[in-house]
Amino acid sequence: IPGLPIVPAAVAVVLLFMALNLFGVTKVGNAQIVLGGILLTAFVIYVIAGFVHPAGFRWETFIAGETIFVHHSVWANLSRMLATIALVYNAYVGFEVIADDAEEVSNPDRNIPRGILLSLTMTTIIYVTVSLVTLGTVPWQQLAGSETALTDAVQHFIPGWGVPMMAVAGMIATLTSVNSAMLSATREAFTLGRDGVWPTVFSKLSR
């Protein structure tokens, strides 16, 4: 948001979710469901509109950037793939925190593995389809120097309200990350305190 002071805004977000955590795991989980649902809806709209609209995904644009392995040797393709993996890995960091909250989940032996597999599957589908639409809409040369690739692409096939939608989606993505990270951190602190690794004060419960 132009003109918004970064540090005060960040502090406000942290305090907001810290206060939310004081109301218990159920409130935190419900907030995550709502925020995640809004974020998923925005991505679904982005992908569908990008593939359907004439000004959206174009195979010619996608191929022009050589974004898939075309006319390269095996070693060249392998080198490109490994270089990409190093970057893509960070996008998947976070699914492991599901296990941190195992004690808050009913039937964790069944639901935790399902949650991890389902989250990885959904994340992979979203990342692949969003990347296809983005790289097939805007030439990679334009995206290379951009810090707002999705908003650059969405204005081609959802003019008007597309850019605000993706801007809000970006902010919500940050909020979901903060919310899940804070829940995971509190559970880790509680467990470490209970096991005697950290001071026992961290294992005390209000009720």
Which residues are covered by each model-predicted region?
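Membrane-interface helix termini and inter-helical loops of multi-pass transporters
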Residues: 1, 55-71, 140-148
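Membrane-interfacial loop-to-helix junctions in multi-pass transporters
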Residues: 2-8, 69-79, 155-166
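Junctions where cytoplasmic loops transition into the N-terminal start of transmembrane alpha-helices
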Residues: 34-38, 99-135, 188
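Hydrophobic alpha-helical transmembrane segments of multipass integral membrane proteins
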Residues: 11, 15-18, 37-47, 87-94, ...
